[in-house]
Swiss-Prot record:
The keyword Secreted does not apply. This is Ufm1-specific protease. GO terms for biological process: positive regulation of chemotaxis; protein localization to non-motile cilium; proteolysis; response to ethanol. Belongs to the peptidase C78 family. It comes from Caenorhabditis briggsae. Thiol protease which recognizes and hydrolyzes the peptide bond at the C-terminal Gly of ufm-1, a ubiquitin-like modifier protein bound to a number of target proteins. Required, with oct-4, for the localization of a subset of 7 transmembrane domain odorant receptors, including odr-10, to the cilia of olfactory neurons AWA and AWC. Operates in aggregation behavior, and responses to oxygen levels.
């Protein structure tokens, strides 16, 4: 199989070692470390019964042909390299990414899809992460980090599918096909900036706005919302901007018993600097097609497995190490155990880590104003990232992953003077939500108090009171509600807090959770440590729950409510206890 041969069948073939092509017309770019990590992630999963004796691994390569970039190399055991899995992978990726190649490992090649080249790999190369050997065997590639770029265009598209009893699978597939065939009729409007993405759309001066917006943009934070419209005519070439466009999807009913499946798809597609109107239209149409196909495949899988017809929720992710977004339809009404098993399958399919969650709904990106959120969208997220002009004294270790800033006077509760530990607890809980360890909402003060009553630590009259809690109570509630273990650091003075800086640094390196510290009748949240081994100088990144103002990031960072504090911040005359919540190591 030469680099130019295409394949459209599924299976494995034994291949003789290939010599590299004599000439190289175009170089592709690939991040070999990302490829090696994907292989390691797959191998980290324990094998299923069906793969217990299966050692053959292959893979598929997805990329951007126009840019000659390999974006993903997905590895899989032979049994998982199926046409349906290939279609599911493609339907979940950004609409500008397509199948570009296959993988040959130790002389055995994946024969699936229409790849234009084959990566020549060996088990030893992958296990040793040997970039030099890869480049020697694959001369059309340059090893380079591929940067994330571009803005995200996002729109909500609703569609209803009527499914006849006993023929649900057939009707789901037909409905998805009809929606894909009609996708050319959809247009996307942003009224604020007078932007229209549609078929037969001529270039206008408004394109300059898109170039300005997309230059230097990042897809997970730079977003333009569009309203989806559907043309009522088949030929859209002569439509004016305001003609024959309505936000509707036609539904055909018959006289038989049917199930009505309603889906609100979050259609997301990238926009890059220099894009033409036609570039955007092609990606928008492909993104809608992929949402329909992804919904169809998840629905059919649910029917085949005996779960019946289930609704799905659109979710967009930026998994760790990825430079493009992942788009999924998640089953809404499955049991928690069913959802967990499904997430494990997705982790294997997309070569995500086996030791930590990546695809919980709480980890999805709220790109649209109506995206699903499991935390209060008004709260400030990761305020420490907005601290500017800080010069480290030594080595900085800090919290890993997002969290929300909880402080006095939020949620309509006046807890000034007594609620600081409750707020620190809520900040810690938000970390566990946003990093995918739970979908349970942040507990209120009353919820926290009731949990302490339930375990026998407090009497019933404690519920609804304005009584303080401390580090011990926080650990009790985390264990009761989330089954989490906590470590403690107890000190007799503020000076001892400084002496435990190395221990705190190890916590942030390994666990990464915010740390609640209580002492001197106050509670704070430690987000990081700056420690100089040579001089002993130590500073602490503190999030102060005693703030009573509005969600103003400038005030919070400039007035010291989220700031680096010197060792003298801790009182020499008081003891302090720290709670270090431990994330589970087997949670997906």
């Amino acid at each position: 199989m030469s680099g130019s041969q295409t394949v459209s069948v599924i299976g494995y073939t034994k291949m003789a070692p290939q010599s590299p092509p004599a000439t190289v017309n175009e170089l592709w770019f690939i991040d070999t470390q990302a490829m090696f990590q994907n292989y390691a992630n797959l191998r980290s999963f324990s094998k299923s019964n069906s793969t217990e004796t299966q050692t053959t691994i292959g893979g598929v390569v997805f990329g951007r042909k126009a840019r000659k970039q390999v974006i993903h190399v997905f590895f899989a055991y032979a049994e998982d390299l199926t046409e349906s899995n290939l279609q599911f992978l493609e339907s979940s990726l950004s609409s500008d990414i397509e199948l570009v190649g296959n993988v040959n490992i130790d002389g055995q090649s994946t024969l699936i899809g229409n790849g234009t080249f084959t990566l020549q790999l060996s088990s030893k190369m992958l296990e040793n992460k040997n970039t030099s050997e890869f480049l020697d065997q694959n001369v059309i590639f340059n090893n380079d980090h591929i940067s994330m770029e571009g803005a995200s265009c996002v729109s909500k598209v609703g569609f209803e599918w009527s499914l006849r009893a006993g023929r649900e699978q057939e009707d789901v597939k037909s409905a998805a096909e009809r929606l894909s065939m009609a996708s050319f009729r959809f247009s996307y409007l942003n009224a604020e900036h007078e932007l229209v993405i549609r078929e037969h759309k001529p270039e206008t001066a408004k394109q300059k706005y898109m170039d300005k917006f997309t230059k230097g943009a990042l897809p997970y934070k730079d977003v333009i919302e569009f309203t989806a419209m559907q043309s009522l005519t088949r030929d859209t070439s002569n439509d004016t901007e305001d003609q024959k466009l309505v936000p509707t999807v036609k539904v055909t009913k018959d006289n038989k018993h049917f199930t009505r499946l309603v889906t609100i798809g979050e259609v997301v597609f990238p926009a890059y600097f220099g894009d033409s109107s036609f570039d955007l239209y092609k990606r928008a149409r492909e993104a809608l097609n992929r949402r329909a196909n992804n919904t169809m495949m998840v629905t059919v899988n649910g029917i085949r497995s005996g779960r019946g017809v289930t609704t799905t929720t659109s979710a967009t992710y930026l998994p760790p190490g990825w430079v493009s977004l992942l788009h999924l339809q998640l089953p809404s009404k499955w049991t928690e155990n069913e959802k967990r098993n499904y997430r494990i399958r997705l982790h294997k399919l997309f070569n995500l880590p086996s030791s930590k969650p990546c695809l919980r709904l709480s980890q999805s990106l709220p790109l649209h104003s109506e995206s699903v959120r499991l935390t209060n969208k008004k709260l400030i997220r990761e305020p420490h990232l907005s601290i500017s002009n800080y010069q480290p004294a030594g080595v900085v270790t800090a919290v890993k992953g997002p969290y929300n800033y909880h402080h006095y006077m939020q949620d309509g509760i006046d807890d000034s003077g007594w609620g600081c530990a409750y707020r620190s607890f809520q900040t810690i809980w938000s970390w566990f939500i946003l990093n995918g360890y739970t979908d349970k909402p942040v507990p209120s003060h009353r919820d926290i108090q009731q949990a302490l009553v339930n375990i026998g630590d407090k009497e019933q009259k404690f519920v609804g009171s304005r009584q303080w809690i401390g580090s011990t109570e926080i650990s009790y509630v985390l264990n009761e509600l989330l089954k989490l273990e906590c470590r403690f650091i107890a000190t007799n003075s503020g000076a001892e807090v400084v002496e435990r800086a190395r221990e705190l640094a190890r916590h942030f390196e390994t666990s990464g959770t915010p740390v609640m510290i209580g002492g001197n009748m106050l509670a704070h949240t430690i987000l990081g440590v700056d420690f100089n081994e040579m001089t002993g100088e130590t500073k602490f990144l503190i999030l102060d729950p005693h703030y009573t103002g509005s969600e103003d990031i400038k005030t919070i960072t400039s007035k010291g409510w989220c700031a680096w504090k010197p060792a003298s911040f801790w009182s020499a005359d008081h003891f302090y206890n720290m709670v270090l919540a431990q994330p589970p190591t087997d949670s997906i």
